[in-house]
Amino acid sequence: MTVFAASQQSAAGAGMLPSHQARLACRAGQADTTAGVAPGYVQGNLAILPEKFAAAFHRFCQLNPKPCPIIGMSDVGNPMIPALGLDLDIRTDLPRYRVWRDGEVIEEPTDIMAHWRDDLVAFVIGCSFSFEEALLADDIAIRHIDCKVRVPMYRTNIPCAPAGPFAGPMVVSMRPMKPKDAIRAVQITSRFPSVHGAPVHIGLPQSIGIADIAKPDYGDPVPIADDELPVFWACGVTPQAVIAAAKVPFAITHAPGLMLVTDLKNKHLAVL
C-alpha cells in the first residue's frame, strides 16, 4: 500500500478530507504520482513566476484555455491559496517540484521553502486527472492508473497563442482506448472545460508532431493494444514547454504527473 493510500484510510477514520491528508503526505516527503489519489477532488498543475512575468502569463492562459485553464492564483508573495484548500501551502503540498533558471530545470526538490520569494505569483491550472474519475465511473479504463505509472505526455506541433515572452507548442496527455470508449470519453470530458475538456486529437500521433508514441517527452510510456486508439487531451504541462522556450530567469513548476490536490470537488466542475 502506498503512503497516499494508507493516509487516505487514516483520514477517513479521523474525519479529515482525503485531499487535505494527501497534502499532508506531501509535506512528509511522499513523492508518488497523484493519479487516483483523493478520488472526487480536483487536482492542479502548478506554475510559479516572478510578478514581472505574471500578467503576461495570465494573458497566455486566457488565450489558451484548453491547455491552461486557471483554477486558482495566489496573491504576490503569498504561498497560501485558501480558495483551493484548508491550510494549503503551495511551497510544501505537492510531491515534487521543478526549479527553472533561464529555461532549464536545475533542481527537483520535494518542497520549495528555500526557493520562495516575496515577488512570486502561483498559478494553479486544471488537470485531466480530475475528469478521470468520470471516465472510471463509466467503466472506461485508464491505462496509466492500471499500470501504476505517470500519464504519458508529449510536445506537439499544435501552436499556442503567444502572449508577451510566452509562446510555444501545446503539450498533450495520452490515454489509449478502444474506439467505442474514445467516443464516450469525448462526450464525458466535454462536460469539464475547466480541466481541459474534450480531446484535441484522436489517433495518428505523427499528424500532431509525435514521432514515437513509445517515447513520451514527460511521464511514462504505456502499452497500446492493436485494437486501441491513442486519445490526446490538452495538458497543463504546456506552461513548462513555454517557460523553457521563453528562458524565464526563474520559475517553479510541479514535476509532471505529481500534482496539487485541492479541496474542490470534481462534480462542481461539470457544466452539464
UniProtKB/Swiss-Prot annotation:
Pfam families: D-Glu_cyclase. Keywords: Lyase. The keyword Nucleotide-binding does not apply. The keyword Endoplasmic reticulum does not apply. Its EC number is 4.2.1.-. GO terms for molecular function: lyase activity. Belongs to the D-glutamate cyclase family. PANTHER family: D-GLUTAMATE CYCLASE, MITOCHONDRIAL. NCBIfam families: PRK05463.1. This is Putative hydro-lyase RPB_3621. It comes from Rhodopseudomonas palustris (strain HaA2).
